[in-house]
């Protein structure tokens, strides 16, 4: 009988110890929540809402954190399911867009098939700004815009895209493609 009492006592102590450890893990999980995942390439230095919040030279606001990652890598991080041709290297941050030069949509993709030929632009102002404005005011929702300048002229053609999964490919020429950045 003493043998069984001793065995039950050891079992009871083990159960109490297990429950105590479980409670400690549960409590620590409540007071120390999981941190946001780190941005690839460089660790976040501080939180931000716009690029002006990032005072370090060459840093931009991506995913709510200041980082020095390249524009192409930032676009891949920021835009869900984006596919970018590895030959595309010319990308610039603008306050509201990732702006790619020598780039067009893959017209075989669902993104490319959503292309709307908005027409020729003969603006005395920046034709890219005009195309961007058309995209911003497009009633069905515009995901990206593309401006293709005719060789040797100040005239060009504006295209709008409505599919939310961009597929970009390299195109040698005076083509500019812009995709909105996530603004917090």
From Swiss-Prot:
The chain crosses the membrane at residues 7-27. Induction: Early structural protein. Residues 1-6 are intravirion. Keywords: Early protein, Host cell membrane, Host membrane, Membrane, Transmembrane, Transmembrane helix, Virion. It is a single-pass membrane protein. It is found in: Virion membrane; Host cell membrane. Its main location: virion. Residues 28-184 are virion surface. One of its GO terms (cellular component) is virion membrane. It comes from the Viruses. Belongs to the asfivirus envelope protein p22 family. This is Envelope protein 169. It comes from African swine fever virus (isolate Tick/South Africa/Pretoriuskop Pr4/1996). The lineage of its organism: Viruses, Varidnaviria, Bamfordvirae, Nucleocytoviricota, Pokkesviricetes.
